[in-house]
Amino acid sequence: MRSGLLPPGLNESDAESNSEDEATLENSGLNLQEDKEDESIRKTEIIDFSTDEPKTETESNVNAYEECPSGIPIDMWNKFQELHKKHSEQKSTTSRFRGKRRKRSRKDKLKNEKELHSEPSSNETQWKELTQYFGVNDRFDPPVKRKKVEKSGLEKRIDQAVEEWNIEKAEELSNQLATRELGVKIAKAVACHNFVKAKKEVENSQAARKKKKLAWGFEAKKRWETKSNMGYM
């Protein structure tokens, strides 16, 4: 009971009910504040737990390998730890070795590409030498009007395939004919190249012989001149 006068229109029972309501409101406000504080504490705990999760997992794994479980002898556990360490070391060494091999393979590939681009291959040089002699002897062939053109069996088969509208067969036969003609050209070019090479060798040998003969002849002529001059003296 509160001491003092009550305001008009209120009884003691009304005052008691109002005091009880005020007490419940105060208690509810305190409960809300406590709930908010609990929620903030829980959030901070969750954040801390999420940040500490990987550490705890790694620590638990390390402890699992370091601590000897119950029911296993210590000697066996020590052997297991040694094997585990060796296995991890082998993994690290193999990963390093693979990285070095990849770097070396890349360097080798770059070197090979540079060599291919910088230096022409021997096949290309030989091909260039042969292409110089393609069609060299064509001028000695008779003209087309006078020459009797006789088709080969392959050409006749191509004409037959074209008449039958068998395009795939005609293309295949035409490729065979092209390779045959190219082979004939290459054979002629090789023969011409060999002929030119042999001719140059003969010319060089003849020139060397002539030089030797001229040298001996000049010396003999000089001796004869000296002898003749001595006879007149």
From Swiss-Prot:
Coiled-coil regions listed in the entry: 144-164
Basic and acidic residues biased stretches: 39-58
Region (Disordered) location: 1-126
Stretches with biased composition (Basic residues): 97-109
Residue ranges, compositional bias (Acidic residues): 13-24
Keyword entries, A-Z: Coiled coil
InterPro entries named in the record: FAM204A
Record-given protein name: Protein FAM204A
Lineage, uppermost ranks: Eukaryota, Metazoa, Chordata, Craniata, Vertebrata
